[in-house]
Structures are given as structure tokens and as C-alpha cells.
Amino acid sequence: MKKIGKEQVRKARQTLAKYKEGKAVLDKRIVSNEQWWKLRHWGEIGYDKDDTRPMPASAWLFNSLANKHADAMDNIPEPAVLPREKSDEEVAKQLSLILPAILERCGYEKLYSDGWWYKLKNGSMCTAVVWDPDADDGMGDIAIRNADILNLFWEPGIKDIEESANLFYVTLVDRERLNLMYPELLGEDTESVAGGTENVEKYKTEDKTDDSVKVEVVDWYYKKTINGRKQLCYCKFCGDRVIYSSEDDESCADGFYKHSRYPFVMDTLFVQEGTPCGFGYIDVMRDAQMYIDKLSQVVLEHTVMMSRKRYFIRQNSAVNEAEFADLKNRFVHVAGNLGEEDIREIKAEPLDLSLIHI
């Protein structure tokens, strides 16, 4: 009898829903930070897109993050393996040669670059270190990938993800592709698993995506104590259907990974208590960016007021308003005598120089 079936998966989905609710604020902050990064932050501070006022977006915050990313790229770490004792010297030398080759093969420089962009924006980056069984024509090898924190779910209130009883990573997979990968999962009834993004928060992108043709595939990691030893177990499922379970795999009798640790590593910028995620430079600098742009908005609005003069016109004035408003007209007709009370310029006072200097 299978140890992991529909009942266990349904309970896991209930746990996933609780974990998602626990990190809802973090997910919204990450999505909002991406808008600030793309200089589309006016909508994030409550301004409607139909507002006719100027909405300048200076790149002060953007340039600050770009400079910090350049500093990080100038200091890419390299593995240095040192022996703990004399008998380890030969192994340390071998690892010193092997690890750089693995990192180069995994494209670590790009992973490091992308991870630092994410870390600067959101305060944390997450790296997945897993075993890829398809690498080297099926021989398998270590794989390193960046994981989007929007897709990762852990127990609310813990600071180290290793303390979480369960860990979920959710990916969206096209239904047809899923059927090609696991034909026994859906069978002929390809619509039997509901589509859509129930658990994953979405970025506000320019692309129009159809998530109804995608389904959520969940990587579920959890820990069990067997014979006094903690073991890491793994289950991949879609809907309430099990794709793979390490508990039902005889080759994983000692656990999915022998080190019994989750394959996700969090790297935090500014630490927060009660969560494995930190906060980033956008969280610190967004108010300063907002003040810069709001002051620029005031200056631009006042510049328009100063350059485009407005006038008071008496209701029964002799001035032809249509001709007066049309700057192409060289002549403006009036009926009768034109007095000073018929039309008067609305004076706009110059801005205080202290605002300009700020």
C-alpha cells in the first residue's frame, strides 16, 4: 500500500493554503517592489492612471541599486576548500578543482547576478541546490537554480526554513506539457486537474498571460523522525494526484537527501525577526524616491502654471473667448469698449528657491 496518496496530498494542500496566507504580506511587498524597480510606482502610492497631473519618475533609486549590483559583481565569491586535518588535504585539493567546474557548468555567474538583483530589491535571494537526474545524458549531476520566493512557502513565524515542518515550491506548468511529461497522471481526461494560479502571486507584467491553460505542480518537502534520525522526504503532486513520493521509493530508504536538509538556501540582506526573509534597499529607499518625485511633480505643475497663463474673464465680457483661447489667431474681436475688468491675468507666484535647491 502506498504511504502517500490522495488523502495525504489533500492535507498537504490545506497546509500549503495556511502557509500562503501567512506570507501574503511578503508576496504583495515583492510584487510592489518590482513596480518601484520598473519606475511604475505612482500606482503603488495611490495615484490613478487617469490622473492628469504630471507623474515624473526619476531613476535615483534605480541607479542606487545598479551601483550596488556592480559592487557585488566585482566581488563574486570563489570556493576555497581547506582541510580540517592533515588527512583531508588531498580531498580538499580535489574539491578545490571540482567545485569551480560545477559552478561554471551551472552558469553560476549569471545565477549570482540575477540573485543579487532579487536580493537588492526584496531583501533576500533563494538558491535551490538539487540533483538533476537528467544531466549528462541521464547520469545526473548537481544543479543550482535561483528560486522565486513568491513560489516558496514555509511555516509562518519561523526564522530558519530548516525549522519549518513542511516546505512547498509551486511551479506553473502548461497542461499539454505536463501530459507529455507524465502521461499516466492525467490520462485521456486532460481537463481533470483545475487550471489557474491558486497559490502563486503574480507580477504585474506587460505580457498578457493565459493561466487557465496551466496547472500548479507542487514540490512538497517535509521531515520525519525515523529510528531517532531526522529524514527529509519529498513528494511531487498536481491537484490531488501523486507524481512521485520518496516514501514509496525503495532507493530513498535513508531519506531523499542524506544530509536531511531542505534544498533551498536563503541569503538575506537586512535581517528581520520572525521570518527567513529580510528587507531590501527598495523598502528602505522608497520614501525618499517618493519625496523626490512628488517635489518634481510640484515643480512641473508650477512650471506649467507659469508658462501657460490663465485669465479671469467677466461673464458678460466683450472678449471673444474662442478667438482669445486659440493662439493661432493674430486678432481677437471684442464687442464695444474693452475695460480692465473684462479680462485679468491670474498671477502665479514663483516657487520658493528652497524647493528648487532641495
Residue ranges, per PLM feature:
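Hydrophobic, often aromatic-rich secondary-structure segments at membrane interfaces
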Residues: T303, A322-E323, A335, D342, ...
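Amphipathic interfacial helices
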Residues: F331, E349-D352
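Conserved small/polar residues in nucleotide/adenosyl-binding loops
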Residues: I356-I358
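Intrinsically disordered or highly flexible coil/loop and linker segments, enriched in small
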Residues: V25, N75, E104-Y112, K121-M125, ...
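Extended, helix-rich architectural segments
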Residues: M1-C233, F237-I243, E247-D249, E321-F324, ...
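Catalytic nucleotidyl-transfer cores of nucleotide-processing enzymes
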Residues: G239-L327
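General structural signal for secondary-structure boundaries
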Residues: T171-R177, P276, G280, V284, ...
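Active-site-adjacent bridging/hinge elements
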Residues: M266, K328-E345
